[in-house]
Amino acid sequence: YEGRNSYTISEAEIRNYFPELMTDYVGTCYGMYFAEVADFYCRENNDEKEMMKLVYQSLRALCAPALPNELVRSIFELKAIVVNGEYPGVPEERKLEESTRYALNYIAESSVEKLYTFTVSDKVLAELSQIASEYRKRFMDRSFKSLEILKTLC
């Protein structure tokens, strides 16, 4: 309900506790990073459904053993930039694998629910990670504590 200067949640029904992440310290750190990025982008009184769906689907993807955490992180970072309206598109001046270009377009254009339906080669993952990192530094003008922890763990 709405208070004088804030909203109060009086009840919630939790449907997914992500029990797989309870024993996965690295996965939990990724989840904390996703929450920290969402906190960076989300503003009170805005419709942030897409960002919340992105965080939820990303946590589900962390629980899928077939998807490398680095791929989940890269997709999350790129899609967060897309959702926020800052995505500059595929870097045309760079020589990239055709599969990387396809993956970047897929991430930008797909619904959040369909994001985590593919895997990529190690080379494509390296290119996606590099581009996501460059875009993160360009559009997210702060450091994230959970990302610093992840860098020491991985």
Language-model regions: role of each:
Residues Y1-C154:
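Non-catalytic alpha-helical scaffolds and adjoining flexible linkers that form interface surfaces
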